[in-house]
Amino acid sequence: DEQHSVIRAALLHDIGQLRLPRELIGKNDLNEEEKRVLDNMQAEGFRILDQVYTGDTSVKRICAQCYRCIRDFQDGKRPDLRISTEARVMAVAQTYDQMTAMQFGQNPASEVMAIKHLLDHPEVYDANAVQALIDSIHILAPGTSVELNNKEKALVLTLNPENVLRPVVLNFRDNSIIDLGLRGNRELEIIDIMKTMDNRHVMDTEALKRQGFQVEEPKYVEVPPG
């Protein structure tokens, strides 16, 4: 069925690149000759899929449509979105995976930057597929530590249903609460997710309560003198 076809396509879409020259692996800025080599490798992969899935063209079709959609966008062309839903879903998943995965010679993009890229190009990446990805990975769930573009560190307090990248956050430096969804804060944005929690901050629980947030305070134990 369609779901199985998407799964197979996701696993096999780059099978043709197994023979890709080492110097082209992970390279983004390709010249025309290198693009031709990559196209030939992909075409060989599609021929392999034809041989493996005799009589079933769905896997090859999804892979080919996804490849052409992303490739046209990279070449500055407007992709033809008259492609299958499965190919649209895979284009979103593949782009997110490629941007956030470890790559030889360069650092991966943050999850935030990858989602921002997908949201910024609705002419390429299907909005429903992008939203499904956001819903599945819970990228900025409450409790997530983040870095802002002003170098400040903050903690996500509540989600923004209108824009997942602009939640309400708590600034670690001064315990101020910042609603990134407000127009007055439009110059601030999250640029990365912190992988480790900074335990050096002190949270002002009273300030949170005044803003209407429910705070579970730790139980303190009195230590007898002496």
Where are the model-predicted features located?
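Histidine- and acidic-residue-rich, metal-dependent catalytic cores
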Residues: D1-G226
